[in-house]
Amino acid sequence: MEIVGCRADESAYPFRPAAAMLFHGITGGHIQGIMEEMERRSKSADSRLAKSIQVNSRETRMPSLNPEKPTLCAGCGGKISDRYYLLAVDKQWHLRCLKCCECKLTLESELTCFAKDGSIYCKEDYYRFSVKRCARCHLGISASEMVMRARESVYHLSCFTCTTCNKTLSTGDQFGMKENLVYCRIHFELLVQGDFHQQLNYTELSAKGGGIAALPYFSNGTGTVQKGRPRKRKSPALGVDIMNYSSGCNENETDLDRDQTYPPSQKTKRMRTSFKHHQLRTMKSYFAINHNPDAKDLKQLAQKTGLTKRVLQGEQCSGFNSHTTRRLKIP
């Protein structure tokens, strides 16, 4: 933003070269000196109007002023007839018209101003509306400051701490997130285990074939993808596989006993399925006729026996394997 001159009034520059001038009672040497002085002043005034100005380390030249096309103010839209005006964001402004759109502070005496989406801001309001803010303390983050990122949130280094114990988390530490709150690994596991104990319906899970939803979020904070199959660690309170890097568990590897409860220190066991006599007879006679039933056949058989399709598939595989083995025995 610069203050530049404007040749709005011809009377402001009294010394201009004329095509013909009359001098009476003045010697030739004096006339020559007067003409040289007038020419020097005229060139000095023109050079001040045409000089280039330096803005933000790049050269910006003042637009040429066409007397036939008046210069208009970008703020009020009126004609600029003042001797001085402001040049900001490649537009001309009255001294009184360049102001912050939020606090209405006149920026005539300010060294800098900021423009965004066609609006002018002072320095304070621009940083208040445009700068990234820490998700924990909600204060602004400068462009030169080191930050920690998790999902779409940005944190100061000192603000990236566990919500429960306030432990500072650094690069490489494993952490979890729930509802945009950051937890260390220990407290995140305790939080997830508590949610599972409150929300899981073991009867419904067994009826649907088992399966536990993926953990909300779990990361080691490095932002890199682990190559190969991630290692798993058994949680002592649940039969859930918590991966060291990414969240989630395999629903095909988890079975819960709906009729038996276990103390927190004991691992859960796979549920053993027991059959009644009429169920065994029905399955045996059915699989003797059809060794490879499709989904529709299994559905009908499940309705007859009262068992799930998953149990029937397991019994089908075991029965088929034993049948094949018997046929391959050497007499």
Curated annotation (Swiss-Prot):
Q: Which GO terms describe its molecular function?
A: DNA-binding transcription factor activity, RNA polymerase II-specific; metal ion binding; RNA polymerase II transcription regulatory region sequence-specific DNA binding
Cellular compartment(s): Nucleus
| Entry GO terms, CC | nucleus
Q: Which residues bind DNA?
A: 268-327
For this protein, the record's InterPro entries field holds: HD, Homeodomain-like_sf, LIM_Homeobox_TF, Znf_LIM
Q: Which residues form the LIM zinc-binding domain?
A: 71-132, 133-194
Q: Which UniProt key words apply to this protein?
A: DNA-binding, Homeobox, LIM domain, Metal-binding, Nucleus, Repeat, Zinc
One Pfam family assigned to this protein is LIM
Q: Does the entry feature the keyword Repeat, yes or no?
A: yes
Q: Region entry Disordered: which residue ranges?
A: 253-275
Biological-process GO terms, alphabetical: dorsal spinal cord interneuron anterior axon guidance; negative regulation of DNA-templated transcription; neuron differentiation; regulation of transcription by RNA polymerase II
* Role this protein plays: May be involved in gonadal development.
**Could you identify this protein by its name?**
LIM/homeobox protein Lhx9
Organism (species): Xenopus laevis (African clawed frog)
Origin organism lineage: Eukaryota, Metazoa, Chordata, Craniata, Vertebrata
